[in-house]
Amino acid sequence: MTKTFIFGHKNPDTDAISSALIMADFEQQTGNTEAKAYRLGEISAETQFALDYFNVEAPELLNEDLKGQDVILVDHNEFQQSADTISNATIKHVIDHHRISNFETAGPLYYRAEPVGCSATILYKMYKERGFEIKPEIAGLMISAIISDSLLFKSPTCTKEDVDAAQALKDIANVDLEAYGLEMLKAGASTTDKSAETLVNMDAKSFNMGDYVTRIAQVNTVDIDEVLDRKEEFEKVMLEMSANEKYDLFVLVVTDIINSDSKILVVGAEKDKVGEAFKVQLDDGMAFLSGVVSRKKQVVPQITEVLTQ
């Protein structure tokens, strides 16, 4: 049987790592014994907390050339967010909950994208549809991914399907959703021990928006001001990365996971467009965004709209 590489996006978050591991288990249950989960970056503190809690080993870092290899993408589809050699691979499946952009294949494939808050929610539905066993550690990974992507069900991306999935899984995983979720989110919200470069790259994605390449990074915290006290450090890193990677715009979204608000820091020639997108005035490159917590639903579409007019 041909080996199958399964992975989420670069700078993986909890959903990207968890969904790769979950999909590998799903494929094993279909009889694809050569399916294996990989990762395209370092494990975050939040994700490591979940892996340790449910006693699951982290996926291996992908270093292989994917030319001619069978792959399954989870939690992403845009090639600039994927493995460097993805255009040479044979994409068999995609399981995702994001917009579809910069994606094409030479042959047909199984593509499942749903407007839910988390890729793991789709995978939960797939297990139920096939009558596959959901082991406690798989249930735990599903819950962790859902809580992470939905910020404990507070994000506007969170749907009834996400909540219902987590509720159905909690007894299998033997966790209290509120207590476990808050502990996991707080594990990932510590920033004082991390460099500005680490924070800016921890959860960052690149997007093609019309003629512009935009980089959007997000940092979750319990104290926005503590993070942005290091504004000059962040600006230096963001400007250097923009020059090296040819980003037209770099947006750092610092999100308060307790109060569900964010502040943004923006660099780039088109930064005034970001103020226009959110109908705010940038003050020294920064602005407060009340109620904004979701990059996918509350940041990317708004900036895309002003950059493609």
UniProtKB/Swiss-Prot annotation:
The protein's Enzyme Commission number: 3.6.1.1
Give its localization.
Answer: Cytoplasm
Enzyme type, top EC level: hydrolase
Residues that, per the record, bind Mn(2+) 2? 15, 75, 97, 149
Cross-referenced PANTHER family, in alphabetical order?
BNIP - RELATED, MANGANESE-DEPENDENT INORGANIC PYROPHOSPHATASE-RELATED
Tell me what this protein is called.
Answer: Probable manganese-dependent inorganic pyrophosphatase
Q: Which SMART domains match?
A: DHHA2
- On whether Kinase is a keyword of this UniProt record, the answer is no
Q: How is the cofactor bound?
A: Binds 2 manganese ions per subunit.
Q: Name one GO molecular function term.
A: manganese ion binding
> Species name for this entry?
Staphylococcus epidermidis (strain ATCC 12228 / FDA PCI 1200)
List, separated by semicolons, the cofactors it needs: Mn(2+)
Keywords, in A-Z order = Cytoplasm, Hydrolase, Manganese, Metal-binding
The family note in this entry says:
Belongs to the PPase class C family.
Q: Where does Mn(2+) 1 bind?
A: 9, 13, 75
Question: What's any one GO cellular component for it?
Answer: cytoplasm
Catalytic activity field: diphosphate + H2O = 2 phosphate + H(+)
